[in-house]
Amino acid sequence: MWASFMWHGALSPGRRAHSALAQLRCILDSELEGIRGAGTWKSERVITSRQGPSIRVDGISGGILNFCANNYLGLSSHPAVIQAGLQTLEEFGAGLSSTRFICGTQSIHKNLEAKIAHFHQREDAILYPSCFDANAGLFEALLTPEDAVLSDELNHASIIDGIRLCKAHKYRYRHLDMADLEAKLKEAQKHRLRLVATDGAFSMDGDIAPLQDICRLAAQYGALVFVDECHATGFLGPTGRGTDELLGVMDQVTIINSTLGKALGGASGGYTTGPEPLVSLLRQRSRPYLFSNSLPPAVVGCASKALDLLMESNAIIQSMAAKTRRFRSKMEAAGFTVSGADHPICPVMLGDARLSSQMADDMLKKGIFVIGFSYPVVPKGKARIRVQISAVHSEEDIDRCVEAFVEVGRLHGALP
């Protein structure tokens, strides 16, 4: 009797798997419904053209002005960059089918690493598939339980995740608060190495880290300085070296991580640049480097040409800066609050998640592509539409964007 009960009552492996899958679907459906209900659902628009100031979007007739790309210098569709990618593809193939330390290193990879190090005036550089990987691979390889890392509370998610992976003692200081950083540095004096980690420019707020003060405190308390320059490389500073050049502390920042996927052609890839022994250690221990395929040759060729163009002239940097000032001044004159410093990331602060999402949708109806950001990407109550200016936007593009903001803002009560 008992055996019969067990036979008929127990679920077969197939039925147990089906039951577990059904439970998972129920949990996921509930999570997704919660996101929709909160008004924070993120939809992916499908672009059917090249990246640029004017794009085509699936389902929408006519050209759309793009104000939400990281294409700060407009190099993602630059003819010379595209041609360099094609030539490298033809000469070196589609990919390496290998990691760097096996048979995935070509001369072009070493040449690009040398060019990056020269550009940043550092000893050496190492390429990664993305800057997310560079951040994920740095802290775990460098820091031990004897060490400490001190991180700005609004650092990019990739920095936060990278720090979580390491075994160092972790301190978080209030955003841009140098008094709090100093207090944390005092607490961390007992540790072997102390590394202050910060974004150079913060991607959601458009504000710039006070690197002069950070470097001063680091020197005072015997700490190293790490800066993520993803939203600075190529266009901040007189020659586009980044926030350390902008603020005159290039010789005081120890480690820089940045990307090839934004201003420098926009294709893909990231890197770490700094002291030669550090880069050598990363080649031996950094897991994203050791266990990821090499950057495709075409991506390497595009990035290398983008750096060449940047080092030939800073005219494109000046153009982007002038257009950024134009947008910010006109938006503020219209009554909007635009966060951050004179950075091409221009967050139009709205506060309410639904409002930012609805206004972004209505901006698209007027031919302007922008994105609303809300929790959990930004803190609750800090929803905004992030506008990003490119050197290849015309003054007419800027003015048309501002006019659309004014019309949509009045429609939704964001302006009187």
Swiss-Prot record:
Family, per entry: Belongs to the class-II pyridoxal-phosphate-dependent aminotransferase family.
Keywords: Acetylation, Acyltransferase, Mitochondrion, Nucleus, Pyridoxal phosphate, Transferase, Transit peptide
Enzyme Commission designation: 2.3.1.29
Transit peptide endpoints, chain numbering: 1-18
Effect of deleting the gene: No visible phenotype.
UniProt-listed InterPro entries: 2am3keto_CoA_ligase, Aminotrans_II_pyridoxalP_BS, Aminotransferase_I/II_large, AON_synthase_class-II, PyrdxlP-dep_Trfase, PyrdxlP-dep_Trfase_major, PyrdxlP-dep_Trfase_small
Any one cellular-component term (Gene Ontology): mitochondrion
Stated name of the protein: 2-amino-3-ketobutyrate coenzyme A ligase, mitochondrial
Organism, scientific name: Mus musculus
Top EC group: transferase
Gene Ontology terms: biological process: biosynthetic process; L-threonine catabolic process to glycine
Cofactor requirements of the protein: pyridoxal 5'-phosphate
Residues found modified as N6-succinyllysine: 42, 184, 323, 365, 380
Highest taxon, organism lineage: Eukaryota
